[in-house]
Amino acid sequence: LTKDLFVRNTRKGDNEIYILDHFSAPNTLLEIGRLREITFRASGGGTGEKLDIDYFDTHKNCYKQLIVWSPEDEEIIGGYRYLVCAEAQDQDGNYHLSTTHYFEFSTAFKEKYLPSTIELGRSWVQPNYQPTVNPKKGLFALDNIWDGLGALIRFYPSIKYFFGKVTMYPDYDTSSRDFLLFFLQHFFPDSEQLIKAYHPLQIGNTSAYAALIEGKEYKDAFKELNSFVRERGTFIPPLMNIYMNLSATMKTFDTAVNPDFGNVEETGILVTIADIYPDKKERHLD
C-alpha cells in the first residue's frame, strides 16, 4: 500500500482507507481475495476456491477495491469493490457489471439511473474484526468502511446513486428472511419496475407478516420485525440494517439466488445519495 493509493483516515479507530485495483496493487488484491473467501465461506457462502477473485476484479476495466487498513495490526479490516457504471458501458450501450448476470435492467434504469450510479459489491469485514468475534476491534469496522463510501462521493460529484446487492446466507432462518423481504418490499418498493431477477427467490405466504405491520409507521413496524427475528434466535443482517435506516427513498428489487457463490440470496437495492438522512451524512459523507 503506497501513499498514492491513500484516501483518508477513518473518523474512529485510527485506521486508513485506500483505493486500489489489480493493476496498481496486484499483491494486495491477492490478499483481499484470500480474506474475502475466508470471510464469506465462514458465513456459508464463498466460491470454494482459495481466493475470491473473479473476472471483474482483474479485467481491463476492473472494479476498484476500497479497503480499510489497520496500521497498528498491519491487516486489512474489510472493504467493498466498486465501479462507476458509466465506465462499464460498451459501444452498443450494454453495461458489463457483476449484477447483470443475475438481474435484468429495464430501459428506464439504464437510461435514467445507471449513468449516475456507482455499483457496490463484495462488502466484507474479515472475521478478526467482526463484532461477534472481537467486540473491541469490530466496534468501528463497518463504520470505517462507510467513511470510505463518503470519500467516493467527493471523488465522483456527479454520482447520484449507490446500487448493489445485500446478501443473506442459506442458513438464515427462513421465516425471518421472508418477513424481512416482505418488509423491504412494503417500505422500499420498486414502484418503477426498474430491475427484475432472472431467477427470483420465491417466498411463502406473507399474510401473517402483513398483519404484524399493517397500518404502522416505519419505526413501529421495524420494532415488530426486529422482535420477530430475535425471537427466532437471529438478527437483521448488519449491512441490511444500515441500508434500511439510511434513507426513506431506498428502492428494493428482487432477490436472486447466486449459484456461483454458495447459493447465497442477494437482494438488489438502490440508494439516492441526496436523500441520505442528515445525521448519516454528517457521520460519513460530509
Which ranges hold each PLM region?
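N-terminal regions that are enriched for targeting/export leaders
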Residues: 1-8
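Extended effector regions of multi-domain proteins
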Residues: 231-234, 264-268, 274-278
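Acyl-donor binding region in acyl/amide transferases
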Residues: 37, 47, 87-249
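Short, flexible loop/turn elements at secondary-structure junctions
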Residues: 21-24, 70-72, 81-87, 122-127, ...
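Short glycine/proline-centered loop/turn elements that form peptide/ligand docking sites
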Residues: 236-239, 258-262
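Carboxylate/His-rich catalytic cores and anion/metal-binding grooves
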Residues: 63, 68-97
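A short helix-loop-beta-strand connector motif used in the catalytic cores of GNAT acetyltransferases and
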Residues: 57-67, 250-251, 261-267
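Short amphipathic alpha-helix that is part of the acyltransferase structural core
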Residues: 9-55, 64-78
